[in-house]
């Protein structure tokens, strides 16, 4: 194993931070270590950690579980700060609201994008200040606006006249961000479509309405779509936002000081390309805005690769060369991302019960396999024609990159309780 791997369930994850990141003040270092910074788990270390959870029977009744790699979260924040050093992330809570994950992000300086009263309450319950929240839902129930005013969440988005009237009535001190619709989000994994964002011809009337209501429009927001593969979409959106700033100035409104560039980021090469496009567009269109605060609403960038899911094989059927397996999580649970987030999942065998001397079945013959979820719906099929070695009931299948829009959107259909899936925390120190 490369480095030490430990279970830290029950520990404040901020306690492992060894440096100040993104302007946050870290909590004290982990006991017996005051100098080393945590790093992502190696593949072998992650496997060893999962095997220890399984063999030590830390999971009751062989239930599915997640591992959250806190070192990966630290690494992702380092990548963000290197690529977009002047842009403060407001993590999109809807993507994955795991409390230890949110606490870790908070300790590293991230703020939070909440879309409902429940999400605001959840973030506040972690001891996070309301001034670190943007209520980034352009269409809110009046009761949620009243609650935001009560607890001091004073920044929100809007894209309609009716929203202006609701905010004027219930939270007139709230600062507003006009949500505009980017013209090019066709390459997003999950495009926003027509649901959100003011069209170009709607911008001036909406600014006039907010001005007449004596509300402060502090800036502009947009979202190019979740998981967008085309970094050029940011170029057009940032140019359009600059046009809104200029329109507000022409109307004699208070100077806009906030630009929210939304989400859509994924880690790795795509982030390198996207961040370069964002920096270029900001330099081109906002180089003269000295008082500008730039924020973003990343979700999957931080969540996707930090979580790994372990599932148990609960059933098996052989039909000639075809192997069919049933596991105890599926499309109505964590793998709902296959349907709603257009995700592609991959599985690695962990033969804890049938082949402990060769856990990954390296060198073993593989078979075309189907993997079903546990519910009685035939739609609940996780993988088809997927090459897997011969596995047995009570072996495990491991799914990496399962942090974005997984457990958060799962259901309890057929009595399989997605919300009950436990998350184990781990981190490693460099060797």
Curated annotation (Swiss-Prot):
Keywords: Decarboxylase, Lyase, Polyamine biosynthesis, Pyridoxal phosphate. Pyridoxal 5'-phosphate binds at residues 226, 264, 297-300, 405. GO terms for molecular function: ornithine decarboxylase activity. CDD domains: PLPDE_III_ODC. Its cofactor is pyridoxal 5'-phosphate. Substrate binds at residues 340-341, 377. The active site is at 376 (proton donor). The modification N6-(pyridoxal phosphate)lysine is found at residue 94. Pathway: Amine and polyamine biosynthesis; putrescine biosynthesis via L-ornithine pathway; putrescine from L-ornithine: step 1/1. GO terms for cellular component: cytoplasm. GO terms for biological process: putrescine biosynthetic process from arginine, via ornithine. Inhibited by antizyme (AZ) in response to polyamine levels. AZ inhibits the assembly of the functional homodimer by binding to ODC monomers and targeting them for ubiquitin-independent proteolytic destruction by the 26S proteasome. It catalyses: L-ornithine + H(+) = putrescine + CO2. InterPro entries: Ala_racemase/Decarboxylase_C, De-COase2_C, De-COase2_CS, De-COase2_N, De-COase2_pyr-phos_BS, Orn/DAP/Arg_de-COase, Orn_de-COase, PLP-binding_barrel. The record marks 223 as: Stacks against the aromatic ring of pyridoxal phosphate and stabilizes reaction intermediates. It is an enzyme of class 4 (lyase). Its EC number is 4.1.1.17. Belongs to the Orn/Lys/Arg decarboxylase class-II family. PANTHER family: ARGININE/DIAMINOPIMELATE/ORNITHINE DECARBOXYLASE (PTHR11482), ORNITHINE DECARBOXYLASE 1-RELATED (PTHR11482:SF6). Catalyzes the first and rate-limiting step of polyamine biosynthesis that converts ornithine into putrescine, which is the precursor for the polyamines, spermidine and spermine. Polyamines are essential for cell proliferation and are implicated in cellular processes, ranging from DNA replication to apoptosis. Homodimer. Only the dimer is catalytically active, as the active sites are constructed of residues from both monomers. This is Ornithine decarboxylase.
